[in-house]
Structures are given as C-alpha cells and as structure tokens.
Amino acid sequence: MSLSQQSISIIKATVPVLQVHGVNITTTFYRNMFKANPQLLNIFNHSNQREGKQQNALANTVLQAAIHIDKLNELNLAPIVHKHVALGVLPEHYPIVGTNLLGAIKEVLQDAATDEILGAWGEAYGVIAQAFIDAEAALYKVTEEQIGGWRDTREFIVDRKVEESSNIISFYFKPADGKPIATYIPGQYITIKVPLTLENGEQRTHIRHYSLSDTPSEQYYRISVKKEDALKKSDPNGVVSNHLHANVKVGDKVLLSPPAGDYVVDQLSSNPILLVSGGVGITPLLSMAKATLAKQPEREVTFVHSSKNKQYQPFANELSQLEKSNKVKVSTVHSETDGQITKDKLEKFINPSQIKDTKVFICGPVSFMSAINKQLIELGYPKENISYEIFGPLTNV
C-alpha cells in the first residue's frame, strides 16, 4: 500500500506546523488516549509521560515521518519495532492510536486542520501503522520460534543478587519452568513487568527495559540495576529500579519478555570496536566486550568507562579480567579526581590508524553521550560508525 501523491504533498506542507505544534499535539494525544483507554497505562512508562520525554519523542517521530513521507523506506523502524515487541504492542492498539492522534491534531490546530489535512494524515497513518504491524509480526514470530523463545511474558526466578558498586546491583534470572532460554546478541535488553500500587491505591503494571550485562548464557539472564537517589513520592523517578533494589529478593518470581533491541555488535565483522560508557551505561557494553573476547579473541576492543569514583565503579573485577586477557584495552576515568572524558583524553586511549574502520558504541547519560559523540566526530570517526543506546524514549544526541 502506498500513499497518493496528493496526500504526500499535503503532509509535506504540514512540516512547519508540526515543528511548532508537534509537542502540543502529542501531549494532547496521550492525555486523551489514556483518559479513554486507561488500560494502555499498563504499557507506557509513567515517568517518561510525567516528564514529557515520551511526548517529545513521539513529536519527533511524527515530524520525521512527515519529512520523509515520500521515502518512508529510509526511516529506521527497527528500534521502535523492538520496543513495541518488548512492550507487547498488538495490531488492535493501532486504531486506538490513530483515532486519538487525528483527534489531537484537530483539537490543537482547530480550523487549520481541514478535512483535507486530516484525510491525508489518516491515509499516511494507515500506511505507517501497517508497516509497523508487519515488522512486529515478523519479529514476534522469530522471537517465539527460536530455541528457548517465547511470546509476551515468562516467569523467571531471581537466582542471585550481587552488589557491583555502592548503587548498582546485578540480578540473575533463571526460568521457573527449567526449560531452555533464548540466546541474545550482546547489547540487547530484556523487559521486566512489575505490578505496583499507586498512591491512590490503584495498581498499574510498570514496564522497564534493562540491558543484559553479561555474555550470553544458556542458564540465566543478568541485568544490573542502578538505584536512584532521593526518591520522592511526588517525583517517583526510578520507581521500578528502586523497587528491585529494596523489595525483590532471591527466590522471588518476576515476569520477563524475551531479549530485544537493535543496538548490537555485528559478530561477523572483524572491525575494531571502541566502547565508551558512563555510569550504569556500562551494562550493554560490558556484554559486548565479554562476548567479543569469547567469540572473537583476535578482534581489537578498546573499552573506556567513566564513573564518579571507585565507590561508584561497577564491575571492577570483570574489567580487570578483560584487561588481563591482553585482548581488550581497558581505561577507567573517575570524574571526581580525573575530570570528565575529553577529546584529549580520548586521543590517548585510541589507535589513530583505525579511526575510519572502528565501530563505536556509546552508552550513558544523554549529556555524556552528546559530548562523547561530538568529540569522536572531531577526532575523525565517521558518524555512521557511531551507535548509542538511550535508556528511555528514543531521541538524538
């Protein structure tokens, strides 16, 4: 199914309007959709809604769709498709989203949202929604039919809790049914669903993605969770992470969705790898480093990690083991004593002759990734060779 040329022209003409009113439209969209369909609150991240992150992310997605409406095949749907499958998004959710999105456009733009504009966007949404539905159906099928695979959630038991630093704990999960578990590509995440009671007594399912932090195993999954400081009831950032730290114990059961995500190392490539992480952003990169050492011991890996100080430095022993292998070059920076990672410091860690061929993976706070990304580009790393993972709604760095 393709869009008519008339609809393409109309949507292109709405780009300036979306640049001005996009966030207002998506904010209105979420408000109206949740009011009419409160069950969807069990799919979306409440903190991201409260902080406006999800609204901004959706506004950017809609804007990019409008800009590329004549070349939708150029849009990278994979990150969103993986998120949707991890969250359990189904085909029947798309008409709900479409109805509320068009309604929000009309509510915000009022008379400027003519029948012609709404018709064009309705047609476009149908095409885009079908592209997502088809891609998600294919991913659901592959995920479910692989060895040890499953669909939706599966019950796991907390086998171990290990303190990695003063604010990070690793959780080891084994399947409650004792059956095989699906493997994963280093860099992927699993999704945990936690029922929590809100202040008003209402119970909601909170869903969070956590990077898998170990090399793939046939016996367990490992995630490593940071405890958030100064949690307030009025501002419940880290509500799931802090719940895991405080209340989830060895022997408890949890519900997990299968591994997902497209932020992964190409294990068929021999290109050098540069890993740069900040704080708990180390988790997917540690998995990449350990798996590469195990499967491609001759592949060059440089790992640069920044943490506040030794107290907050996670996985010190595992980083030491990587370094002792003489196959992975490890550098740690403690910002309290060493300062932030700078372009000059990065130059000391890297091999200048490999810059053009190196695949780079960055993970950490958005401000950290933005700074590192800028420094790497200034050093000559091709933009297309730099990948980053954001713990939250998709955005640019």
Swiss-Prot record:
Regarding protein family, the annotation reads: Belongs to the globin family. Two-domain flavohemoproteins subfamily. In the C-terminal section; belongs to the flavoprotein pyridine nucleotide cytochrome reductase family.
> What residues does FAD bind to?
189, 208-211, 390-393
Annotated GO CC locations: cytoplasm; phagocytic vesicle
* Gene this protein is translated from: fhbA
Coiled-coil stretches are none
List the cofactors.
FAD; heme b
A GO molecular function assigned to this protein is: oxygen binding
Q: Where is this site: Influences the redox potential of the prosthetic heme and FAD groups?
A: 83, 389
Q: What's its EC?
A: 1.14.12.17
| Organism lineage | Eukaryota, Amoebozoa, Evosea, Eumycetozoa, Dictyostelia
Q: Where in the cell is it found?
A: Cytoplasm
Please state what the protein is called.
Flavohemoprotein A
Q: Organism source for this protein?
A: Dictyostelium discoideum
* Enzyme class, broadest EC rank: oxidoreductase
Q: What causes induction of this gene?
A: By submerged conditions, in growing cells.
Keyword Cytoplasm included in the entry's annotation: yes
* Entry comment, domain topic: Consists of two distinct domains; a N-terminal heme-containing oxygen-binding domain and a C-terminal reductase domain with binding sites for FAD and NAD(P)H.
